């Protein structure tokens, strides 16, 4: 069986940013709080003594968590700012899907499909290298056209746009039309009937 120290470390690791209270850890490990306190002190000493670990134990308001040592703050701040390590929002995923299937497409055309402004999502997707400007549309104002990049293909794990899942155009149009059915309730009171 694993040592109390290893089991404690595993619990704290899984708890992540939320951390765990003394009481919760004692219950889960089935040990008294005094024994737990000693294990926490040992774990902290282990982290402090090991120059090859980036981890330390943090206690705040009787909640304990495993965090990175303050020495790594600048490195981790720089890492978190890199576009590839930020997740895509739902809006960005919607825009990316629209661009992938309808490319080349203008921002206004994306906005028309979504019903909201997509400028922020387009800028984010460009910063991530997932979409690019693909010329200008021959129309009033000569708006930018957007298309996906080779990195987009790598990002979603395909070799060409031909591998995108086919969307039946009629099914898509039916779904769009059903949103605006004539028999749809005009106000919330009709939903109760």
Curated annotation (Swiss-Prot):
GO biological process per UniProt: cell division; chromosome separation; DNA replication
Protein location: Cytoplasm
Pfam families the UniProt entry points to: SMC_ScpB (PF04079)
Keywords, ordered alphabetically: Cell cycle, Cell division, Chromosome partition, Cytoplasm
Main localisation: cytoplasm
Gene Ontology CC annotations of this record: cytoplasm
InterPro entries tied to this protein: ScpB_csome_segregation, WH-like_DNA-bd_sf, WH_DNA-bd_sf
Function: Participates in chromosomal partition during cell division. May act via the formation of a condensin-like complex containing Smc and ScpA that pull DNA away from mid-cell into both cell halves.
Protein family membership: Belongs to the ScpB family.
NCBIfam families given in the database record: SMC-Scp complex subunit ScpB
Listed PANTHER family: SEGREGATION AND CONDENSATION PROTEIN B
Quaternary structure, from the entry: Homodimer. Homodimerization may be required to stabilize the binding of ScpA to the Smc head domains. Component of a cohesin-like complex composed of ScpA, ScpB and the Smc homodimer, in which ScpA and ScpB bind to the head domain of Smc. The presence of the three proteins is required for the association of the complex with DNA.
UniProt name for this protein: Segregation and condensation protein B
Lineage of origin: Bacteria, Bacillati, Bacillota, Bacilli, Lactobacillales
